[in-house]
Regions:
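Phosphate/diphosphate-binding glycine-rich loops and adjacent basic-rich segments that engage nucleotide
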Residues: 147-221
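A glycine-rich phosphate/pyrophosphate-binding beta-strand-loop-alpha-helix module
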Residues: 94, 98, 102-142
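General beta-strand structural signal in soluble alpha/beta enzymes
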Residues: 82-84, 111-116, 137-141, 166, ...
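Active-site cofactor/substrate anionic-group-binding motifs, chiefly glycine-
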Residues: 48-101
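Flexible, glycine/charged-enriched surface loops at secondary-structure junctions
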Residues: 23-31, 46-49, 258-262
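Internal helical hairpin/lid segments
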Residues: 225-262
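Generic N-terminal amphipathic, Lys/Arg-enriched alpha-helix
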Residues: 1-22
C-alpha cells in the first residue's frame, strides 16, 4: 500500500493565504485553514483540501459574503442563536462552539443554534474544541438536498454530518464522526475520477427508479472544479435506522432552530 506524507503546516499556510487573497480577514482565514488541516489530521481527506472548493464555488456564485461577520442575534444563560450573515460556516461554527463552551462552563450545559452560513468543512473540529476543555459535545447541520425520501425519485433530504465526542480520562476520547445518509458529492467525484463504483447501490435513476452503484451515467463535472460534481441521480438512504437519524437531525437543525431552513 502506498503511503503519502504531507506537511500540515504548509497546508494551513497555503489555505490561509488563498482565502485572504480572496478577500477574507485574517481571523476568517485562520478558521478555514485550521478546520481543513484538522480533517487531514483526522484522515478525512474529503473534508480536507477537497472541501475548500465548496466555499470557493459559493463565493464565485455570490452565495457567500466573504467580508460579512457572523453575529449573535439572541441568547440566554444556556442557549444562543448565531446568524452567519452569509459568511462561511467555518467562522460561524467556531463562534457557535466557543459560545457553547463558554456557557456550559458556567451553567453545565448549553445549546447554540446557527444558520444563514455556507459550508463548514469537518464538524469534528468543532466538537474537538469542547474536548480540549474536557467537555462532551455534539454538532450537526442540514445540507443541500442529497438524499431521497423512501420511495422517492428526487433528492429532498439532506446528508447531515453528525459528530460527537466524550472525554475518557487518560484514554483516547469516545468519538463518532459520521454522515446520516450514504454519500456526498465528493464520493460521486471520487468514483467518477477513479472509475470505480460507490460502496453500495445508492443511486436512484430519476426516470426508472432503478438502483445502481455506477456513477458514469449521472456524474457531471463542474468546470474549473475537481471535487464538486453534479449528479442527476437521487441518493438512497439504505436503512430505516439511518433514515430515522436523518429525520431527527433535520428536526434539531432546521425545525426547532430559530433560523433553520428545512
Amino acid at each position: 500500500m502506498e503511503t503519502r506524507s504531507e506537511n500540515i503546516y504548509f497546508l494551513e499556510y497555503a489555505i490561509k493565504r488563498m482565502w485572504m487573497a480572496a478577500g477574507a480577514t485574517e481571523i476568517h482565514a485562520d478558521y478555514v485553514a485550521d478546520a481543513i488541516a484538522f480533517a487531514h489530521k483526522q484522515g478525512k481527506l474529503n473534508q480536507g483540501l477537497g472541501v475548500y472548493e465548496a466555499i470557493d464555488i459559493a463565493l464565485e456564485m455570490g452565495l457567500l459574503d466573504i467580508q460579512s461577520e457572523p453575529q449573535v442575534i439572541a441568547e440566554g444563560p444556556t442557549w444562543a442563536t448565531v446568524d452567519g450573515n452569509k459568511s462561511s460556516g467555518y467562522w460561524c461554527l467556531n463562534m457557535m462552539a466557543d459560545l457553547a463552551i463558554e456557557k456550559a462552563r458556567t451553567q453545565g450545559i448549553a445549546i447554540v443554534f446557527g444558520g444563514n452560513h455556507n459550508d463548514a468543512g469537518s464538524f469534528a473540529r468543532y466538537v474537538y474544541k469542547a474536548f480540549e476543555q474536557d467537555m462532551m459535545a455534539f454538532s450537526s447541520n442540514n445540507t443541500v438536498p442529497l438524499a431521497a425520501p423512501f420511495g422517492g425519485l428526487h433528492n429532498k433530504l439532506s446528508c447531515p454530518p453528525f459528530d460527537a465526542i466524550v472525554p475518557a480520562g487518560d484514554k483516547s476520547p469516545i468519538w463518532a464522526s459520521v454522515a446520516l445518509a450514504e454519500f456526498y458529492d465528493a464520493d460521486v467525484s471520487e468514483a467518477a475520477i477513479h472509475k470505480k463504483p460507490l460502496k453500495g447501490k445508492w443511486l436512484i435513476d430519476p426516470e426508472s427508479g432503478d438502483l445502481s452503484d455506477d456513477v458514469t451515467a449521472y456524474a457531471k463535472p463542474i468546470e474549473g472544479y475537481g471535487r464538486v460534481w453534479d449528479c442527476s441521480a437521487a441518493g438512497q438512504i439504505e436503512t430505516p435506522r439511518t433514515y430515522a437519524l436523518n429525520m431527527w437531525t433535520e428536526a434539531m437543525t432546521a425545525i426547532i432552530n430559530p433560523i433553520g431552513i428545512p
